Every structure is written in structure tokens, then in C-alpha cells.
């Protein structure tokens, strides 16, 4: 029997056991072929309510377990990602359209997230405070309770596990709503891993579903923290609802990240980073390089080199062919990408490479003559499109990079590292890389953006995870009962 044997999960949701979904089921479609890979259970709002109540009950016992027990579950989970990597890799390639290297990276990060989370239960937290009274005064970190996680399709495993693992390690229970398009990699796989790792029943729930289930998750009285990754528009709705219900929402949203190429850059070295930043996973990453800002002295050569590289990147089925780009997730997303490309041409940009597609396979595209007022430059494309604009001074580069509603990632290519860091300090983003492109992720590194990219670094590393998934409680102790003049 395979680890992801569909007899377990077909038409079911995970609530500590595999139960029939009240919302029916939906096809799991392979974007590259249109083939049906299985049928995943779709939760209803009623399923969500039942799971949230069950999770709240299970959380109390889970929080009371020793830190050694919780750490052991997370370590076993990390081992399981590695033990079943071959099968899980195939699912990532087929369900999400990942090339093999991207699937390997997701599995590596999933294991690392669990191993890092395994250190959280024994991580020293809290403070001993001075007190005006003769007593011991402390600030302690305690579990938040039930954590709701809403994860997207593009990196389904990473963007689920980075919240699920630390939340569980810190004594919370979790209700996870993966995107139905990638519900196996972003949901079923996590349920199976933690089921086999020995997580007590009821502590993790996996409920694929639509917007109605997401809304019910945010509104449910048992859920105290929401961790959401997705579009800025959807994130606004989540944040507004969470605010009305007086609960915290950690929002990791869209981006339109800039890669700045200074006049002293080595273009031979820069090309690999530039292409990777815009075309990795078909540009379907929040950190994707959405704007290439190139010094005027290098601009023409940069466009020519990037267009040449883009035109030689093979596109096709990553499960059966050796390709650099796989499929776009679905026709709706492909049409959005192409609409932005065509409207950008109408606005004056020139297609230097790509700009065409077959089925869901969109070719790596370079748009020369881009800049403010060009749609693919101004907006998040979420596709393999590289708009290239020019600047003539550091001041202009900083101004152009900062003129965005987003503030997620930034890359700067330069021979002068100090100059690059000084420029980065002038541009408000949550992430900055000197001599690297914009797409980077590590389990230990704080991750998040500013402005319309989200509510800051709430993922990655012990400090961010403890802040995200615990509450601070003030506790005092004294040997005698305090007396008062009443």
C-alpha cells in the first residue's frame, strides 16, 4: 500500500480519522494533461464547525503533554517527509505542475520545518519581571489555542507546513484548509505524515474547501489565530473578518518584487539569477521578480541576454519531460497572465521573447520598454513574465523600486556589496538580497512583507513562530496572601 493510498482519502476529510465530507468531492486535476488523479473530499461549513469544536477539545490535552512528546512527534514527521519523498515528489510534480527540482525543494523545506519546529517545545520563552510587590512576577508564553491555516496552490506543501508544524509544536491544535486544486500535496500529505508520526487524534484537521469554508474558519469562535497565505484581495477580506471577530490574522499576501541591476554588475553572472527570479515555477510565486530595473548603460544588452535565455527555456510536462517550466495551474490563471501581457503591449511594451502559450504551457516572456503605467509592470502577474525598465541613477532606482503597493522581496546585483546594502536600506520590503534574485526561502529565516504584501515577518525562525502562535500571560506568585485595606 502506498503512503498516499487514495482508498484512505477519496471523498474524505481528515479530523483525526478519515470521514466522508459533507460537501461532496472534487476532481484532482493534473494541469499538464487534464487527467484526473483522484477525488478529494470537500468540506462544508458544518464540517468546519464540527472540526473546530473537536480541535478545541483536543488542544487542551495536547498542550498538557510534555515538551519531549511534542518534539518527538515533530521529529518523526520530519523523518517521514524524507522516507516517502519519492512518492510525494511525484504528487507535487503532477498535482501542482512543479518541475522536479522545485518538488525536491518543497520536500526539503517540509522536513526542515518539522525539525526546526521540534526545537520549539524546549525553547526557553518568557521573562522574569521586576515587581513593586514582594512576589515573583513572570511573563509566560502559552499556546494560542486553535490555529486556522489557509494555504494556496502554488507551493502547497511549504505554505501549509510552515504554519502547521510550529503551531503544533507550541501546543496548539490546527484546522488546515488547503486550496482544493492542490489538496493532496497541501493537505492530505500533511494529514498522513502527522497521522503516522503519532499526533493524537483531533489535534490536526484537514478540510479542503471553497471560500465558504475559509470564511467559516475565520469566523469560528474556537479559532483564535488565522495564518493566511494568498492574494492581497482575499487577505483583505480575511483580515477584515478576523478584526470583526477580535482574533489575530497573520497575512502573507502578494508581491511585485524588483531586481535592481546596477551599472557595475556582471551580466554573465546576473542572467541566471534574473531568469530564475522571473521564471521559476512559471512565475507562480509571491516573491517572483516582477520588475527588472536595469541601469541604462546595461539595458539593451540585458534585454537581449534575458530574451535569449528565455527563448531557450523548454516548456512542457514536468512529469514526462526534462523542462524548465511546467504548466500554469489552470486556464483562468493562464488567461489572466496573457491578458496582462497583451494589455502591456497595448501600453507600449515590446515582447522580446515569449508572449505565447499552448494549452496551459506559457512560454517564458520578456517585456522590454516596461515601466510605470504598463500593466505587467504595475501589477502582480503570477506568471513567467519579466518586465524590464531602465534607470539612470541610484535615486531613480530607489524611487522606481519603492513605487509599488507591495513590499515583499528585493534583489540587487552589484560588484559593490556596501553600495547594494545602502540602496536596499532605502527601499521598504520585508526581504532583501544583495547579489541574489528575489525568490529565496529557508525554514530558519523570518519571512513576510509590508504594505499590500502582508502583516510582516510572521513565518520562519523561533522568534517569529513563538510570536505568531502563542499568547503572553502575566503570572505572579507569593508565599502569603496579599492584604488590602478593604
Curated annotation (Swiss-Prot):
The active site is at residues 252, 286. Its EC number is 1.2.1.67. It catalyses: vanillin + NAD(+) + H2O = vanillate + NADH + 2 H(+). PROSITE patterns: ALDEHYDE_DEHYDR_GLU (PS00687). The record marks 154 as: Transition state stabilizer. Keywords: NAD, Oxidoreductase. Optimum pH is 8.0 for the NAD(+)-dependent oxidation of vanillin. Active between pH 5.0-9.0. Optimum temperature is 44 degrees Celsius for the NAD(+)-dependent oxidation of vanillin. Active between 15-65 degrees Celsius. Retains 86% of the activity after storage at 4 degrees Celsius for 24 hours. Induction: By vanillin and ferulic acid. Gene3D superfamilies: Aldehyde Dehydrogenase, Chain A, domain 1, Aldehyde Dehydrogenase, Chain A, domain 2. Catalyzes NAD(+)-dependent oxidation of vanillin to vanillate. Also oxidizes other aromatic aldehydes including benzaldehyde, coniferyl aldehyde and cinnamaldehyde, but has a preference for vanillin. Not active with NADP(+). Involved in the degradation pathway of lignin-derived aromatic compounds of plant cell walls. Catalyzes the conversion of vanillin to vanillate due to toxicity of vanillin to the cells. This is Vanillin dehydrogenase. It comes from Amycolatopsis sp. (strain ATCC 39116 / 75iv2).
